[in-house]
């Protein structure tokens, strides 16, 4: 028996539809207790602040978020007894707002993108004496994935070699943490990032459309270890949403926009590895990440067509 819901962190690795002669496998992170991959860094950042003496009973937490980190922090705050205030850009799905409030968090909506939310969180930190965990630069964010998600992948693949990790980038914590752990075991593993085609700053473009929810913040996060990255793939939001619908209707996997984008890129990498012969086992094994459930995107129209 777990002592509380936070001990339930963890997710399955599931083989999904893959190009012929390849294996694409996804970490289905909606199986975490708060429903996304961001539950892991939310817990790690809070516990790191507690251990450092920066967060004590009675303190309030403030954090800018596009949704999932905020939900994770709201859940952790509910368990540990912290008041949580979340600052979110307008235009993000109504489901995310409702889930945060359901956990008891206060929510402030700002005009603009995640940069505007960061500015407002800075103001609240200074004005109200709240503790900001700063997910974009907090080392506990990638460490959460290095110490939990990465080892889970290694256990779940068994004796197979991971040939590539393909994952979308927001804070960069997921790609950095899992990537560092996998590369320790598989030095030749390919690590590829995925970003929106309309907001492709990793590809050298100017910040653009913030339509993707949870991927492509419009700047390079300090938590993203760019030296790990072998290649960056861009995906159009319409293609990502079409893949979300396919995954739901053909494979029973209800996932969000960044997951659809990552899956498209992962299948492309798997096919390329098969064609080039650059893989270790009988066929290429490509791991990707499904961050959250498509339930958080219903009002966004992702599944309407």
Task: Map each language-model feature to its residues.
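PLP-dependent amino-acid enzyme catalytic core
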Residues: 1-305
């Amino acid at each position: 028996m777990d002592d509380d819901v936070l001990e339930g962190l963890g997710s399955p690795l599931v083989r999904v539809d893959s190009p012929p002669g390849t294996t694409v496998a996804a970490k289905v992170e909606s199986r975490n207790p708060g429903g996304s991959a961001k539950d892991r860094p939310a817990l790690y950042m809070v516990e790191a602040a507690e251990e450092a003496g920066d967060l004590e009973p009675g303190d309030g937490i403030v954090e800018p978020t596009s949704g999932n980190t905020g939900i994770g922090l709201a859940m952790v705050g509910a368990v540990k007894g912290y008041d949580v205030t979340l600052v979110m850009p307008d235009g993000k799905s109504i489901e995310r707002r409702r889930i945060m409030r359901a956990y008891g968090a206060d929510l402030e909506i700002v005009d603009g993108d995640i940069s505007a939310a960061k500015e407002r969180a800075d103001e609240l930190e200074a004005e109200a004496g709240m503790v900001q965990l700063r997910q974009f630069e907090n080392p506990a964010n990638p460490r959460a994935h290095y110490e939990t998600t990465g080892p889970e992948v290694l256990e779940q693949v068994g004796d197979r070699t991971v040939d590539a990790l393909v994952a979308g980038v927001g804070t960069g914590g997921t790609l950095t943490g899992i990537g560092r752990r996998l590369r320790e075991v598989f030095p030749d593993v390919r690590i590829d990032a995925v970003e929106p085609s309309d907001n492709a700053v990793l590809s050298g473009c100017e910040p653009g459309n913030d339509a993707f929810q949870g991927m492509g913040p419009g700047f390079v996060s300090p938590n993203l270890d760019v030296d790990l990255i072998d290649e960056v793939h861009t995906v159009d939001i319409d293609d990502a949403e079409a893949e979300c619908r396919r995954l739901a209707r053909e494979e029973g996997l209800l996932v969000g926009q960044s997951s659809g984008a990552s899956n498209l890129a992962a299948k492309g990498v798997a096919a390329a590895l098969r064609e080039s012969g650059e893989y270790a086992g009988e066929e290429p094994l490509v791991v990707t990440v499904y961050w959250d459930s498509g339930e958080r995107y219903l009002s966004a129209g992702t599944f309407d067509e």
